[in-house]
C-alpha cells in the first residue's frame, strides 16, 4: 500500500431508497476498479448478512477502499462508506455521512424520489457534502430520466443538467461516476499535524479479536501499538491491529488524515466504542471531540418470551451476543403471569424490532413469542414526579397519576396523487393532525402529518403500502411529548387479567379496541370443557365481553326411555363437573392470540 497524499483521497457514500440499486452500483464500482477479483464477486457484495440479502436492505454499514487511476493519469484512493437506507437507522446514516465529503444520490429513473432518500439527502446537505445525482436503471423500458431529473431539481434543488445516466446492472455509465467522484468530491482537509482525531462510523463484534472499529481519520495520524481513548466512554485501549478495508481487512502500520480504516484493540463490547464517538491518543489527546455524537435511544418496546421455558438461558445468551453488535438494542428481564420468564426489549423502530426478532430465531434457533409493541409514555404522578413507562402492565393506578403524555412524530409521506385521499383517511383514523401538503410534480405529492407514535408502531407501514398499492413511502422524526386522555385496557380471560395483552389506548378508542380484541380472541382461543368468558376492562368497568361456549359431551345418548328424572340426574351431574372444572381449570392462550393485537384493524 503506497502512501497516498491527502489531495488524492476521495471519501463518498451512496444515498438511495430501498431497491433503487445501491448495492448493485457498489458491486460495479468494486468490480471496475478491480478491488474485488472477478471470481470472488457475488451479488450485493457489501451486504454480508443473509437477512440483508434476503430483504434487499442494508442494515449494518460497510466500507470499501478502491484504487482508481483517473483519466488524468493520477492514482486516486476512493473510500466508499455504505449507508443503511432505512428510517430506523437514520443515526447510523448521519454518522457515515459525517465521515464523507461527497455523496452519490442514486434515484431509480423509473420511480423517482422517495421519502427516505429525501431524508438522507437533507442529512447530507447538513453535513455540507457535495452531492452527485445519478439516474439509475435507465435500461428499463419504463425509465423516464427527464421526468425524474426534473423531479430531483424540484424537490431537492440540485442542478440535474449534468446528472449521470447509468445502469448498475448493465454496467452503463460506471466510468462516468468514478470520474465525477474524482472531479467533484473535494479532498479531505490536510490536517496531518493536528492531534489525532477519528470518527467511528461502525463497529461490530468478532469472537476472536473483540470489537472491530471502523473509523475515518479526521486529523493527525495513528500507528499500530498506539494507546487510544474513546472520548464519550472514556475507555482506553492499545491498538493490536490496524488496517484498511478493501472490503477484506488488510493490515497496515499507519493511517493518516482523510483515510478510512479499522482497528482492533481487545475491546469487550460495542458499547465501549459507540458509533459517532471520537477516538484520540492518550499521550496527546485532542481538546474536544468531533460534533454530533448522541446516544441512540430506543423508541419501541416489546416483550420477548421463549415458547419453551427451558430456552430462557439461550435467549439471554443470544441477546447478549446481539447486544455486542448492536449498541441501540436494550433489554431487561421480565416476568409475566401468562408467559413466564422473558425479556423486555427496546428498539430504534419497527424494522429494527423485526430484524432483531428474525436474527434471534434464525441465527440462534429460538422459538419466540412477542407481545404487542408499545412506546415510552411519560406519566406524571400525583406526587409530581415523572415516570417513564414502556410496559402497559407497569402503569401507575389511576388514583396515583395526574397525566399521561405520549410521544408524537412528524410523518412525511410521498405518494402518487391518486392515493392522497386514502392516506389522509388512514392518518385521520390514527388520531393524526394534518400539517401540510406539497405538490412536487403533477402526479406526486408530499403529505405531512403529526401522529402519536403508538398509532404508527403496529401496522401503519403495512396499511400505508396497501392503501397506496405499494407506491407511497414514508419517513418520520420525533417531535416531542403531548398530553392525551389515555387509559389502560385490560383483557381478562376466565376472570384472570392477561398481562401480556394489556395495552394503553386513547379513551375514545377504548371501546372499539376492546370489542374488536375480545371478538378476535373468541376466534383464536380453543374451546374448553367449560364456558370461558373474555372481557375487556378499564379499571373495574367491563366495556366489552364475549363467551367461548363449552364443549359438551352428550350424556343423554344412553337414555332411551322417557324417564325425565333419570335425564335430569345425568345433566345435573355434568353441570356440577363443569362447575368444578371452571373453578380449577386453566385456559390455554395460544401464540396467535398475542399476535392478534398487532393485526387489529382500528377502524
UniProtKB/Swiss-Prot annotation:
What is catalyzed by this enzyme?
Answer: GTP + H2O = GDP + phosphate + H(+)
Q: Which Pfam family, giving just one, matches this sequence? A: GTP_EFTU
Binding residues for GTP: 19-24, 136-139
- GO term, biological process aspect, one: translation
One GO CC annotation, please? plasma membrane
**Which Gene3D superfamilies does this entry report, sorted A to Z?**
3.30.70.240, Elongation factor 4, C-terminal domain, Elongation Factor G (Translational Gtpase), domain 3, P-loop containing nucleotide triphosphate hydrolases, Translation factors
Key words of the record: Cell inner membrane, Cell membrane, GTP-binding, Hydrolase, Membrane, Nucleotide-binding, Protein biosynthesis
Q: Does the keyword rRNA-binding apply?
A: no
Query: Has UniProt tagged this entry with the keyword Hydrolase?
Result: yes
Q: Which GO terms describe its molecular function?
A: GTP binding; GTPase activity; ribosome binding
Q: What is its main location?
A: membrane
tr-type G domain span:
7-189
The EC number(s) attached to this protein equal 3.6.5.n1
Q: Where in the cell is it found?
A: Cell inner membrane
Q: What membrane topology does this protein have?
A: Peripheral membrane protein
Top EC class for this record? hydrolase
* Function in brief: Required for accurate and efficient protein synthesis under certain stress conditions. May act as a fidelity factor of the translation reaction, by catalyzing a one-codon backward translocation of tRNAs on improperly translocated ribosomes. Back-translocation proceeds from a post-translocation (POST) complex to a pre-translocation (PRE) complex, thus giving elongation factor G a second chance to translocate the tRNAs correctly. Binds to ribosomes in a GTP-dependent manner.
Family as reported in the entry's similarity comment: Belongs to the TRAFAC class translation factor GTPase superfamily. Classic translation factor GTPase family. LepA subfamily.
- What's the name of the protein? Elongation factor 4
Q: Report the source organism.
A: Microcystis aeruginosa (strain NIES-843 / IAM M-2473)
Taxonomic lineage: Bacteria, Bacillati, Cyanobacteriota, Cyanophyceae, Oscillatoriophycideae
